[in-house]
């Protein structure tokens, strides 16, 4: 299914209607309350959703939407609930990007200025937080209280993972590979699991797709870390070597530091959070010297092979074309 239009998600998060304020209108000499209320509602909705609308107006790869459609080849949930889950996940993902860009001091998102540099930090945070709670309230339409339990569990895990990622960056603490992958499972895997668990809740199938989704989340993040420092397309969308400027301990950086006992140079480059291209190019040479990019490629290939084996164990290959396509996309060519 294609990316949901921004207008549809905007309508999705809009409040149901304004509260009547007859006393206020009387004091102000306003008599046509219907028109005033309509204008007020439109203005409020526009203000609240503006940062979200901005980011939704130039959509990304929609890997989560594709993942939901692919797993529905197995789970076969009703179209109405499938659309609801897609909208909720897209809304949560967009809100999380707004917050991430603030926490990471990013300048670009999908090749354009980040939302908080246009609407301000405070308004962007409020818009993202509103979207989180609106998405939660919409889950009641599924008609099963476990939907909100799943939402709460995965949003807690997502923020736990984000908290560790920020802690390592801000305290200049290099995690182990195991610690990093646990963080990725919590953070990146959160919305992947949320989508699939909600789908399983709405499905007559007893198939458990969560273990496979765990693989996809980890592969996705390692690939993203690799692309951040190697992909020309990524440079267009996010800027050159953004993880180095952010001071982030990404997968290749962790490998380089832990495979080289004399790693003071790379750690100090992270500490500087430099925007200097020459410094970042030097850091990339350090990563190349420790074979860290090759290690990423090997790890992705290994995890992809394991994911495909699990996929074959789970059922009819004729129902796995969509998931196979996602795995092919995630592979580094």
Curated annotation (Swiss-Prot):
Binding locations of Mg(2+) 2: 100, 104
GO annotation terms (biological process): alcohol biosynthetic process; mycotoxin biosynthetic process; terpenoid biosynthetic process
Knockout mutant characteristics: Strongly decreases the production of 15-deoxyoxalicine B.
Needed co-factor(s): Mg(2+)
InterPro entries named in the record: Isoprenoid_synthase_dom_sf (IPR008949), Polyprenyl_synt (IPR000092), Polyprenyl_synt_CS (IPR033749)
Pathway: Secondary metabolite biosynthesis; terpenoid biosynthesis
Keywords, sorted A to Z: Magnesium, Metal-binding, Transferase
Molecular function GO labels: metal ion binding; prenyltransferase activity
Annotated residues for binding of Mg(2+) 3: 224
Binding site for Mg(2+) 1: 100, 104
Binding residues for isopentenyl diphosphate: 61, 64, 93, 110
Catalysed reactions, as listed in the record: isopentenyl diphosphate + dimethylallyl diphosphate = (2E)-geranyl diphosphate + diphosphate; isopentenyl diphosphate + (2E)-geranyl diphosphate = (2E,6E)-farnesyl diphosphate + diphosphate; isopentenyl diphosphate + (2E,6E)-farnesyl diphosphate = (2E,6E,10E)-geranylgeranyl diphosphate + diphosphate
EC numbers for this chain: 2.5.1.-, 2.5.1.1, 2.5.1.29, 2.5.1.10
First-tier enzyme category under EC: transferase
Alphabetical list of PANTHER family matching this protein: GERANYLGERANYL PYROPHOSPHATE SYNTHASE, PYROPHOSPHATE SYNTHETASE ATMG, PUTATIVE (AFU_ORTHOLOGUE AFUA_8G02400)-RELATED
Job of this protein: Geranylgeranyl pyrophosphate synthase; part of the gene cluster that mediates the biosynthesis of 15-deoxyoxalicine B. The first step of the pathway is the synthesis of nicotinyl-CoA from nicotinic acid by the nicotinic acid-CoA ligase olcI. Nicotinyl-CoA is then a substrate of polyketide synthase olcA to produce 4-hydroxy-6-(3-pyridinyl)-2H-pyran-2-one (HPPO) which is further prenylated by the polyprenyl transferase olcH to yield geranylgeranyl-HPPO. Geranylgeranyl pyrophosphate is provided by the cluster-specific geranylgeranyl pyrophosphate synthase olcC.
Additional remark text: The 15-deoxyoxalicine B cluster is a rare cluster that contains its own geranylgeranyl pyrophosphate synthase (olcC), in contrast to other related clusters which rely on a FPP/GGPP synthase localized outside of the cluster.
Similarity-based family: Belongs to the FPP/GGPP synthase family.
Annotated protein name in UniProt: Geranylgeranyl pyrophosphate synthase olcC
Annotated source species: Penicillium canescens
Origin organism lineage: Eukaryota, Fungi, Dikarya, Ascomycota, Pezizomycotina
């Amino acid at each position: 299914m294609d990316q949901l239009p921004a207008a549809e998600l905007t309508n999705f998060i809009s409040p149901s209607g304004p509260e009547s304020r007859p006393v206020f209108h009387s004091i102000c000499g306003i008599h046509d309350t219907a028109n005033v209320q309509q204008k007020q509602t439109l203005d409020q909705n526009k203000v609240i959703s503006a940062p979200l609308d901005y980011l939704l107006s130039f959509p990304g790869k929609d890997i989560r939407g594709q993942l939901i459609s692919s797993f529905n080849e197995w789970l076969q949930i009703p179209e109405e609930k499938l659309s609801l889950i897609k909208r909720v996940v897209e809304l949560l993902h967009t809100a999380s990007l707004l917050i991430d860009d603030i926490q990471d001091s990013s300048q670009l998102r999908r090749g354009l200025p980040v939302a908080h540099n246009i609407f301000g930090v405070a308004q962007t945070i409020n818009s993202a937080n509103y979207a989180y709670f609106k998405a939660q309230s919409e889950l009641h339409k599924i008609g099963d209280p476990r939907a909100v339990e799943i939402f709460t569990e995965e949003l807690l895990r997502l923020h736990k993972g984000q908290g560790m990622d920020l802690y390592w960056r801000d305290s200049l603490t290099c995690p182990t590979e195991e610690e990093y992958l646990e963080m990725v499972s919590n953070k990146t895997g959160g919305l992947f699991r949320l989508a699939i668990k909600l789908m399983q809740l709405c499905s007559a199938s007893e198939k458990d797709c969560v273990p496979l989704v765990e693989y996809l989340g980890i592969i996705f993040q390692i690939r993203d870390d690799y692309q951040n420092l190697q992909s020309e397309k990524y440079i267009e969308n996010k800027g050159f070597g953004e993880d180095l400027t952010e001071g982030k301990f990404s997968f290749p950086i962790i490998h380089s530091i832990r495979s080289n006992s004399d790693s003071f140079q790379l750690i100090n480059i992270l500490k500087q959070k430099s925007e200097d291209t020459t410094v970042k190019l030097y850091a990339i040479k350090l990563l190349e010297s420790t074979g860290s990019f090759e290690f990423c490629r090997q790890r992705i290939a290994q995890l992809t092979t394991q994911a495909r084996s699990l996929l074959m164990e789970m059922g009819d290959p004729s129902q796995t074309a969509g998931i196979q396509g996602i795995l092919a996309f995630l592979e580094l060519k």
